[in-house]
């Protein structure tokens, strides 16, 4: 029921933003470019065909660009970035061959302490996808360097909002340094495990040396504003998403939830203080 309700809200929101875009185009002659970053996890064997279909749709309605791409003056109206959190082996088997044979850029965010090991958290599994192993160092090195960008997903895939400052610092620095030593390049990108963060984490990541970090809050990351934001949202995509749900997601229908997450973060500290006073 919860999923259906969220779907209906997203459908309504998509209609609202479509009307808004139309009015801006008619009244002001304004037509904004939009960039949306997609966030995948596992690509199970039985969902490979669906994943390929999704990529074909993205290429029909827009352009798939690398995560280090910044939109400037262009006639293209929609851009998409493809990211994979966790680095499950299923992406090597079921996603990478198609991506690389079609010259599609993508990014993989690795929790470095689990390279070559079975993931302990497993918050996402496909139907025919048992506990998966994270790709190892050799598999990372074999990825096409012209298409694949490797980023940090912390060291141990912990929930940052539940650990102290010192541990946060270790997680951010260790994963960055391990990947930099392995690839002999700078690692400027971070994907936040579970997508949960606070302002202190954002500032810490900046101080550690990351140039861009990704949450799991759905939103357009670029809209002709000229900003190259440090903190960027992403829309969660599953290869088993129904086709209509996928279309609504990539057109921005689920972006309303980013406003909900921001409001929740603002309210949470206030409620915590009130409960402390009562105690």
Predicted regions and their residues:
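Acidic/aromatic-lined carbohydrate-recognition and catalytic surfaces
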Residues: 84-89, 93, 102, 111, ...
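A short acidic, glycine-rich active-site loop
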Residues: 126-134
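C-terminal active-site subregion of NodB/CE4 polysaccharide deacetylases
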Residues: 2-83, 89-94, 162-169, 173-189, ...
